Amino acid sequence: MKEKLMEHLDIKLEQVRRTMNTWEDSADMAIAFYNQALGAVELAGWLVYQDNPELEQEILKMWNDEYRIKFEKIIWGE
């Protein structure tokens, strides 16, 4: 499940990259993709919480330590 979520987040990262370089309202669109990715992480955490709280923590840590930072660097240019 974690690998499938990572694939989805990688796709969203690429959408954000392309959007930031293409569209006039790119920041708004990129933030929408960011929110979709965050929603996927929250849903994945909720789905695994009952059966595997450790995996939920792993998913949230992956988001906070890796993907959130990648998204923010693209969107805010840091």
Regions found by a protein language model. Give the residues of each.
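Acidic, low-complexity, intrinsically disordered interaction modules
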Residues: T22-N64
